[in-house]
Amino acid sequence: VSGDTSSLGTCIIGTVAGDLHDIGKNLVAMMIESAGFKVVDLGVDVPKEKFIEAVQQNDNVKIVACSGLLTTTMPAMKETVKALKESKLQGFKIMVGGAPVTPEFASEINADAYTPDAGSAAVKAKELASA
């Protein structure tokens, strides 16, 4: 077994296009990092193409986490998940979260997981990475 044994893998995280909120995303990034992941934070207002590029440009990506606080950016989250699924890139799971996001919405847009807060996001990320 080779590679970086100190890491559970890489987590790409960002707030979806059109959304400039970062406090929730930052908390999730900190929790996921402290759980043992390398975190690549793409920032806010991230277009779907940038999420895909980040998966292509980073090694051992296990999680892509999409955050959104505004109901108006939920379509962007849906498009991001769709683009990631259609990209044919493999080996990672997609997590979504943010105030307007529900388990039902996450399921509807084919995300692999929904978490309501930063603590549960870290737990779920570990579960998904080891699945």
Regions found by a protein language model. Give the residues of each.
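Cofactor-cradling patches in redox/metallo enzymes
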Residues: 28-35, 40-111, 124
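A charged, well-structured terminal subsegment
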Residues: 124-131
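Short acidic-hydrophobic, aromatic-tinged amphipathic segments that line or gate anion-handling sites
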Residues: 112-118
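Long amphipathic N-terminal alpha/beta scaffold segment
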Residues: 1-25
